[in-house]
């Protein structure tokens, strides 16, 4: 699973996702992509599950680019522990995804294969998504 090699601080504030994505809204690498339509935190496990579903359907053909990275540490306190006594330890890593953000890109496969692969990957994610493709020039 993806997580940063090192960070300046171990824990971060929860934060909010305001407005649309400021960058990463266009296809940069592949011919097909999966774009987020709503704001949400996506965990490293969800990203990995989607990646596995996509590559499994593509049967190792083509190429997959993951355009999001889980760099947000999410903390939690153990069960049945009273409030207070400081912030909990890091439980998992997540990524804030704003509407309009391209999360996955594919290339080297036909459109019908790419559409089905990204549909299977989108089922593993907690947000509504849209299939996008590069406009033929």
From Swiss-Prot:
Record GO terms (molecular function): rRNA binding; structural constituent of ribosome; tRNA binding
Keyword annotations from UniProtKB, A to Z: Ribonucleoprotein, Ribosomal protein, RNA-binding, rRNA-binding, tRNA-binding
Highest taxon of the lineage: Bacteria
An example Gene Ontology CC term for this record: cytosolic large ribosomal subunit
CDD domains with a match to the protein in the record: Ribosomal_L16_L10e
SUPFAM superfamilies, sorted: Ribosomal protein L16p/L10e
UniProt record, GO biological process: translation
InterPro entries tied to this protein: Ribosomal_uL16, Ribosomal_uL16_bact-type, Ribosomal_uL16_CS, Ribosomal_uL16_dom, Ribosomal_uL16_sf
Disulfide bond positions: none
Biological role stated in the UniProt entry: Binds 23S rRNA and is also seen to make contacts with the A and possibly P site tRNAs.
PANTHER family named among the record's database cross-references: 50S/60S RIBOSOMAL PROTEIN L16 (PTHR12220), LARGE RIBOSOMAL SUBUNIT PROTEIN UL16M (PTHR12220:SF13)
The protein's assembly and partners: Part of the 50S ribosomal subunit.
Family according to the record: Belongs to the universal ribosomal protein uL16 family.
Entry protein name: Large ribosomal subunit protein uL16
Organism field: Brucella canis (strain ATCC 23365 / NCTC 10854 / RM-666)
Lineage, opening ranks: Bacteria, Pseudomonadati, Pseudomonadota, Alphaproteobacteria, Hyphomicrobiales
Gene designation: rplP
